[in-house]
A protein has these predicted regions:
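Beta-propeller-forming repeat regions
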Residues: 1-129
Length: 129
C-alpha cells in the first residue's frame, strides 16, 4: 500500500516483508541468512512481517508480525500453500476521518482481514475479522 496514512502530505509504504528484507538505509529486517523455501520452492514456514516504510527515504519506520499468522497451512483450504499465500490490501476511513489500512489473507475456505493505523510514528493493530 502506498498512501499518506498519517496526514503529513507524504505517502508511506506498508507491505508484507520477510527475513532478509533490506530497506534504503541497508537495515535488514529479521534474519538475513534465513531461507525457508521447501523442495518445491514454496515458503510455508518462517516469520512474516508487516513493515511501514518512509515513502520519501525508503527507510523502515516500524515492523511487526504479519497478521493473521500462517499457522497450519491446511487450515486455509489446501496443503501446498496456494490459499495461505493469497493477500489483499485496502485503505479505509474506519473512524470517518483518517485513513487506516486493511491487510488480508486467504481465499475461498478461510478469509481474514486485519485493520491497522499509522499514527504519530506508531503502527497500531485496530482489529482482526
Amino acid at each position: 500500500m502506498v498512501y499518506d496514512f498519517d496526514g503529513d502530505g507524504k505517502a508511506e509504504i506498508a507491505c508484507k516483508t520477510a527475513d532478509g528484507t533490506k530497506d534504503a538505509a541497508n537495515t535488514i529486517i529479521g534474519n538475513p541468512n534465513a531461507d525457508y523455501r521447501n523442495s518445491n520452492g514454496y515458503i510455508l514456514d518462517g516469520p512474516e512481517y508487516l513493515t511501514v516504510f518512509n515513502g520519501q527515504t525508503g527507510e523502515a519506520m516500524a515492523t511487526t508480525n504479519y497478521l493473521p499468522p500462517r499457522g497450519n497451512v491446511s487450515a486455509w483450504g489446501d496443503s501446498y500453500g496456494n490459499r495461505v499465500d493469497r493477500f489483499i490490501a485496502a485503505v479505509a476511513y474506519l473512524d470517518g476521518q483518517r485513513p487506516s489500512f486493511i491487510t488480508g489473507r486467504g481465499y475461498y475456505t478461510r478469509l481474514v482481514r486485519v485493520a491497522w493505523d499509522w499514527r504519530n510514528g506508531t503502527l497500531k493493530h485496530r482489529w482482526t475479522f
